[in-house]
A protein has these predicted regions:
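FAD-dependent oxidoreductase catalytic-site/capping-region signature
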Residues: 2-196
Length: 196
């Protein structure tokens, strides 16, 4: 409880919410700010003082899939996350990166003389930012929707063909089985699945 060092604090010590553009009804961007820097998750931390403001889209429109790899239930499934596969998601990613740059170059942070490491100051155009978002983008570890819930009629027919569960969390086509975790969420809640 009273120790010091990087393992004694949460990885993200600051969070923020904002709109990618004024037309949004509510915040559709979230920042997780970490007092560290690294090239990518799982690699060693950089040895210089740094912060990493990670921005994410709270309402992505890209859709992936998860499928059984075989009839063996112990075999890992095939997963395609399909991040940033829609124009809307790419637009939000670019807007988030631009807002992040504006924050980091603000007068309030001027005395810290922040330097952009990734994607780097040579990345200037929207197209270049899109490419970097595709290159650098990753999960924030709150997946949902692999067993999406939706409206199902009395005959077991779903309005949305991707619906796997009815409104009572019952798995369509299987008796006596309910799914009651984040995989049942048809869309992701803003602010993470652990405490929206």
């Amino acid at each position: 409880l009273f120790r010091k060092g990087p393992m004694t604090m949460p990885p993200s010590t600051l969070g923020a919410f904002a709109k990618s553009d004024p037309s949004q009804k509510s915040a559709n961007l979230e920042w997780h700010v970490q007092p560290l820097s690294l090239d990518k998750f799982g690699e060693p931390l950089h040895t210089f003082n740094a912060i990493t403001p990670s921005v994410l889209n709270l309402r992505p429109t890209s859709r992936g899939w998860i499928r059984a790899a075989s009839s063996d239930p112990l075999e890992y499934p095939k997963i395609l996350c399909n991040y940033l596969s829609t124009k809307e998601d790419l637009d939000v990613a670019v807007a988030g990166m631009k807002i992040t740059r504006n924050i980091m170059s603000s007068k309030a942070l001027e005395s810290f003389q922040p330097e952009e490491i990734l994607p780097g100051t040579s990345v200037k155009t929207d197209k270049d930012l899109e490419n970097e978002a595709k290159n650098l983008g990753t999960t924030i570890f709150h997946p949902i929707g692999t067993c999406a819930m939706g409206k199902v009629d009395g005959q077991g027919v779903a309005e949305d063909p991707m619906t796997v569960l009815d409104s009572e969390c019952r798995l369509r086509g299987v008796s006596k089985l309910r799914v009651i975790d984040a995989s049942a969420m048809p869309s992701i809640p803003s602010g993470n699945t652990n405490a929206p």
